[in-house]
């Protein structure tokens, strides 16, 4: 461990001369050597050497500037003190932060008054109805109305306003606002247990309508009776007509004596209180306390003050009521509930003040932190970057290389692109830090040619310099190329642009990865093995003889079974029957004859006679004949010759015909077959560069850029001479230096990849990168093994307003199963290889690996993830992708492509003239901004219905095709989910995924008592009877819920997500976003009632254009509960709100399938494809329904 030495300032241990150096050093020491505080600029290493710290702030860009040095020291010390203050301030904030999130729950459980109250104040009915009976004034109602009078069939009501016109009077409290606005008073429903309902009817023994008629007759006879007006007030209270209650009570007050006014006042106060004019009600009750029934008045006044939040007055009123009637349970319970609420609010106010104080401290801390960062920028402005300091140290120690024992030193120079070191004297050279010397292979002493070999050391700092003064290149150099295929780098002195290409050269020469047809083919000559063929001359045959081409079939050969399996399939390949001459092979053939004027017929005759009269091993001549037929373009004869050469060749030389046969296959576009032969050739002999170059070309054609790059690296390692390889050197070096130009920087394989690496020193090639998100998961019935095809999920890369983001999830579960199979990412299967090959072929090469360019939109490919469900051994038995269906395929592969849309940079790509039609189509499709248009096969939509369907003309599959297809299990429940991100809402702004959870698990609960309205769809049977739903739950949405914050935070457990949603929902019950998230939680948990409670709350508060998010969830719940009519209504509403979302159409189609309304389902699945053409589940369901309609006469589900 290095020990730090405190030295203020900075100086370099470099040899200098002259008095100027001594003067500057003494002046510097006199300035900086003061005080005890010190920076740790110098350190002592483990071997006792004093050297600078690489990241010291005293390493300046201008080390000669003394003023900047002194300012830098002041800034360093200031930053240290400021950092201490920030740390202390942060600790103070964290220690004093109020983290008590369970204050209310703990208070309700521990406070004595809360325990005595048993329920919170909010759960008590503070509008409890009260009244003062006439009997308490010794008045009998029977004395004022004729109870024996008959009542007509149409009884009258006691309308006080028609009996007497009352003038304005302050005694009737007409100055109060509630009385003035009596026409508009609200009338909440009275609870059935309100005692006012039984007062009159129980007393008079008649129905309430009959009593009203009798009161009306009494008022007709005596319009000034305060008793009759009070009876009329009781009547209208029972009828819940506040306006009439106030009118009758005002007249009762007008005619009542002072001692009897309390009856009318309590009636008036109850009506005003229930109409939310509680302050006016308090004034009225206070007037009744002058001479009144103290118990009723005080109890009523206690309820009013509790509602107004006047807790002290409320408690005092309840105490007075208890004095008048000790032991009254309702008053006792309300008194303790008020005290409980009062203390809770006091605690919450204290917590709020604490949090506000913490917030102010955090703002101050943020201000100080910003100041700290600005000072840090000032410090970094003059500081030398770490990489530059490392380079300076390397250069310094290189120049000051010392003799190992004597301490003598000499200055050496790096030459030849830093692959050799030139020293003045022939002395031993020692290097303390030789990071720069990975590519240095020898040292030259003096001016003669004496050299000394050098062993390479570990290369910690990747550098690639043309000379010492150049800055470090950013492009990594994988291996030294001092010796390129047996040639010294001096041989490339005039070809430096090939060996060390610049980025501009690579962009001009290879703007993209070459296509398969643009890559050269090679011929592996036997001369590389030391084998030679006798040169063919005209003496070998008579020119007068008829020219005959070489016939490899006439040769007797022994059958070798070792490699026959590699080429036996090639003999019957139809795609090899075409005649395609190979220009590369023709040039190689002519160069081997060394006479470019000889016609091909004569060359064929040479080879014909050589085969019949061999003067060399026959397999060598057959190898040459294979080259001839490659040049001519006859693949059948070429394969025959090379196959016989392969069988006759010794085992150690079998790589020669294998490589040449593989290049024939590459020329015919059979790149995957070629890779098999080339990998076998590598196993035979791994020292031939041409073998690896051929393998790299095959990988490039298969769009496996990472595999190709690895093959090219292996080729560069070899020292075997290979003049034919130099034509590909520039491409190889461009891909090495600038892999980002060809999207070769990631580990994602874009085509056919192999698990086995070319070199054991490298990690196994990964077929796909770490998955970023999973928007589609599947469960299939265990007995069917049917697999839905990839689900395409679309989302925008930014938060731009014009880049609408659609993130829909489609999940399929089988009835009675709720387990999601885990992905098996450790094995690569042929299914994946076939899938990506199809994917790559469907989309243009410009989009490989990083971006996709489709119809004017630029897309970024994020990753591929596989959820695999197969046999017990975990390996699929056969390949299947797209619409292929095999009856014995027991594996289910669900692949999700997640594509992000980003703004296309201006001037990034020039549109070719042939793309005008596509551009116009893209413009026409912009009315549905969320629709990502991707080219691909589209399912033909049926034409207009006719009496007799002609299925073939509709583009439907034929009955024979239907018998071959594997149908989708339409009875399986498909769950869909429309994320809030489709509305440009970032869920992380609503839910805190970052703060660790330090409290017990909670579950998000929504208000189940929201008022009934059409907005909450309570007219639907499934919503109104949600408590009795037969809902099985949707556990397959678990991963969707756990990945809500996947872009920024890791996956969390279901309990953690539920707790986070519950915390924020508890504070904000009016957020439709949080209510929708809570509904998703309850869908996973299988609690249909709680899920619908949350969806009602979301629908209650959501704007109209956002309602399709909760509507889609509600439609899925109703679908699951087999309430299909309700589900159709809800899903249709979602489509009407957002017709541009494919998931809305798909959901409605699923409901119609469950109802066996297959024609309607077809319509909605086809509209799904119009919005999202590559949505494979919709395609598969269309095919299944079409086949069902043709092959099934009954109306049962297929």
Swiss-Prot record:
InterPro entries, alphabetized: TPR-like_helical_dom_sf, TPR_rpt, TTC17
Domain of life of the source: Eukaryota
Pfam families reported for this sequence: TPR_8
Main location: cytoplasm
TPR repeat residue intervals: 295-328, 619-652, 689-722, 1071-1105, 1108-1141, 1142-1175
Localization (cell): Cytoplasm; Cell membrane; Cytoplasm, Cytoskeleton
Basic residues bias (residue ranges): 902-914
Gene Ontology cellular component terms for the protein in this record: actin cytoskeleton; cytosol; plasma membrane
Example of a GO biological process term: cilium organization
Keyword line: Cell membrane, Cilium biogenesis/degradation, Coiled coil, Cytoplasm, Cytoskeleton, Membrane, Repeat, TPR repeat
Protein family per UniProt: Belongs to the TTC17 family.
The protein's assembly and partners: Interacts with CATIP.
Record function comment: Plays a role in primary ciliogenesis by modulating actin polymerization.
UniProt name for this protein: Tetratricopeptide repeat protein 17
């Amino acid at each position: 461990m290095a020990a730090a030495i405190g030295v203020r300032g900075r100086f370099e241990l470099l040899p200098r001369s002259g008095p100027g150096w001594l003067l500057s050093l003494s002046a510097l020491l006199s300035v900086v050597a003061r005080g005890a505080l010190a920076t740790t600029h110098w350190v002592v290493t483990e071997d006792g050497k004093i050297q600078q710290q690489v990241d010291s702030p005293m390493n300046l860009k201008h080390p000669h500037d003394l003023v900047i040095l002194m300012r830098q020291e002041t800034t360093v010390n200031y930053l240290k003190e400021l950092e201490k203050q920030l740390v202390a301030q942060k600790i103070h904030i964290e220690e004093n932060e109020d983290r008590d999130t369970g204050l209310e729950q703990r208070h309700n459980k521990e406070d004595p008054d809360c325990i005595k109250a048993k329920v919170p104040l909010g759960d008590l009915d503070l509008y409890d109805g009260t009244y003062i009976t006439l009997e308490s004034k010794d008045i009998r109602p029977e004395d004022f109305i004729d109870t024996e009078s008959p009542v007509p069939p149409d009884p009258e009501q006691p309308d006080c306003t028609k009996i007497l016109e009352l003038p304005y009077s302050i005694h009737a409290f007409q100055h109060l606002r509630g009385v003035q606005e009596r026409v508009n008073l609200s009338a909440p429903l009275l609870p059935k247990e309100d005692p006012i309902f039984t007062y009159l009817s129980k007393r008079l023994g008649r129905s309430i309508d009959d009593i009203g008629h009798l009161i009306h007759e009494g008022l007709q006879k005596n319009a000034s009776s305060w008793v009759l007006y009070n009876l009329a007030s009781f009547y209208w209270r029972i009828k819940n007509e506040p306006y009439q209650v106030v009118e009758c009570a005002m007249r009762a007050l007008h005619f009542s004596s002072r001692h009897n006014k309390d009856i009318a006042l309590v009636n008036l106060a109850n009506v005003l209180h229930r109409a939310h004019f509680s302050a006016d009600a308090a004034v009225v009750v206070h007037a009744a306390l002058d001479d009144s029934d103290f118990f009723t008045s005080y109890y009523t006044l206690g309820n009013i003050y509790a509602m107004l939040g006047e807790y002290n007055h409320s408690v005092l009123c309840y105490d007075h009521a208890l004095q008048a009637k000790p032991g009254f349970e309702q008053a006792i319970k309300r008194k303790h509930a008020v005290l409980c609420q009062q203390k809770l609010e006091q605690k919450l106010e204290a917590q709020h003040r604490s949090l506000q104080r913490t917030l102010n401290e955090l703002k101050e801390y943020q201000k100080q932190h910003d100041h700290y960062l600005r000072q840090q920028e000032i410090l970094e402005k003059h500081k030398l970057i770490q990489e530059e300091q490392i380079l300076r140290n390397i250069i310094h120690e290189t120049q000051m290389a010392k003799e190992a024992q004597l301490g003598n030193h000499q200055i050496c120079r790096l030459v030849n692109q830093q692959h050799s070191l030139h020293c003045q004297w022939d002395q031993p050279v020692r290097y303390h830090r030789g990071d720069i010397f990975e590519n240095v292979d020898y040292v030259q002493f003096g001016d003669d040619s004496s050299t000394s070999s050098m062993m390479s050391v570990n290369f910690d700092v990747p550098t690639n310099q043309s000379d010492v003064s150049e800055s470090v290149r950013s492009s990594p150099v994988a291996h030294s190329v001092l010796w390129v295929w047996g040639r010294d780098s001096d041989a490339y002195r005039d070809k430096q642009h090939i060996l060390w290409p610049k980025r501009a050269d690579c962009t001009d020469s290879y703007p993209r990865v070459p296509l398969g047809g643009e890559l050269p083919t090679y011929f592996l000559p036997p001369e590389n093995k030391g084998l030679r063929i006798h040169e063919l001359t005209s003496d070998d045959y008579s020119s007068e003889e008829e020219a005959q081409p070489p016939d490899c079939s006439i040769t007797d050969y022994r059958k070798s079974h070792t490699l026959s399996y590699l080429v036996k399939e090639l003999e019957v390949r139809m795609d090899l029957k075409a005649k395609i001459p190979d220009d590369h092979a023709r040039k190689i053939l002519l160069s081997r004859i060394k006479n470019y004027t000889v016609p091909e017929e004569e060359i064929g005759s040479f080879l014909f006679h050589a085969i019949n009269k061999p003067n060399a091993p026959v397999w060598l001549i057959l190898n040459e004949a294979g080259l001839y037929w490659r040049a001519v373009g006859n693949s059948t004869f070429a394969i025959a010759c090379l196959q016989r050469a392969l069988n006759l060749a010794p085992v150690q030389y079998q790589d020669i015909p294998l490589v040449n046969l593989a290049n024939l296959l590459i020329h015919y576009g059979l790149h995957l077959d070629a890779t098999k032969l080339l990998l076998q050739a590598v196993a035979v002999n791994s020292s031939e560069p041409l073998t690896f170059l051929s393998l790299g070309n095959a990988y490039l054609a298969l769009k496996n850029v990472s595999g190709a790059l690895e093959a090219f690296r292996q080729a560069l390692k070899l020292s075997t001479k290979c003049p034919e390889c130099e034509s590909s050197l520039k491409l190889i070096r461009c891909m090495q230096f600038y892999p980002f130009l060809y999207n070769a920087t990631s580990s994602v394989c874009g085509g056919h990849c192999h698990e086995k690496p070319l070199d054991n020193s490298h990690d196994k090639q990964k077929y796909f990168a770490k998955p970023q998100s999973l928007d589609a998961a599947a469960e299939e019935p265990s007995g069917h093994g049917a697999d839905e095809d990839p689900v395409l999920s679309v989302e925008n890369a930014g938060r731009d307003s014009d880049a609408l983001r659609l993130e829909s999830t489609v999940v399929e579960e089988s009835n009675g199963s709720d387990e999601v199979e885990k992905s098996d990412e450790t094995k690569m299967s042929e299914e994946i290889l076939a899938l990506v090959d199809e994917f790559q072929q469907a989309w243009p090469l410009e989009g490989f690996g990083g971006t996709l360019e489709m119809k004017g939109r630029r897309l970024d490919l994020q990753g591929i993830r596989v959820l695999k469900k197969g046999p017990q051994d975990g390996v699929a038995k056969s390949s299947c992708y797209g619409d292929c269906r095999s009856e014995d395929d027991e594996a289910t592969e669900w692949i999700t492509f997640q594509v992000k849309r980003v703004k296309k940079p201006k001037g990034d790509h020039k549109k070719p003239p042939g793309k005008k039609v596509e551009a116009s189509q893209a413009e026409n499709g912009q009315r549905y901004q969320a629709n990502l248009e991707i080219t691909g096969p589209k399912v033909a939509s049926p034409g207009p219905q006719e009496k007799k369907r002609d299925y073939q003309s509709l583009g439907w599959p034929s009955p024979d095709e239907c018998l071959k297809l594997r149908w989708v299990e339409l009875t399986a429940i498909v769950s869909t989910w429309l994320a809030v991100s489709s509305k440009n809402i970032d869920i992380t702004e609503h839910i805190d995924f970052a703060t660790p959870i330090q409290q017990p698990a909670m579950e998000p609960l929504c208000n189940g008592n929201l008022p009934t309205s059409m907005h909450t769809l309570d007219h639907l049977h499934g919503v109104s009877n949600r408590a009795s739903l037969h809902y099985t739950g949707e556990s397959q949405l678990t991963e969707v819920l756990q990945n809500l914050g996947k872009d920024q935070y890791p996956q969390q457990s279901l309990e953690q997500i539920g707790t986070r949603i519950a915390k924020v929902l508890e504070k904000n019950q009016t957020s439709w976003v949080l209510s929708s998230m809570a509904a998703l939680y309850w869908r996973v948990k299988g609690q249909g009632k709680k899920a619908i409670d949350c969806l009602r709350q979301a629908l209650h508060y959501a704007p109209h254009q956002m309602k399709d998010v909760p509507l889609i969830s509600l439609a899925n719940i109703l679908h699951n509960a087999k309430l299909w009519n309700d589900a159709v209504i809800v899903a249709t509403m979602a489509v009407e709100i957002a017709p541009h979302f494919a998931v809305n159409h798909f959901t409605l189609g699923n409901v119609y399938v469950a109802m066996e309304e297959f024609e309607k389902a077809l319509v909605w699945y086809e509209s799904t494809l119009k919005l999202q053409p590559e949505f494979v589940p919709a395609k598969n369901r269309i095919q299944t329904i079409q086949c069902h309609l043709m092959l099934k006469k009954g109306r049962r589900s297929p």
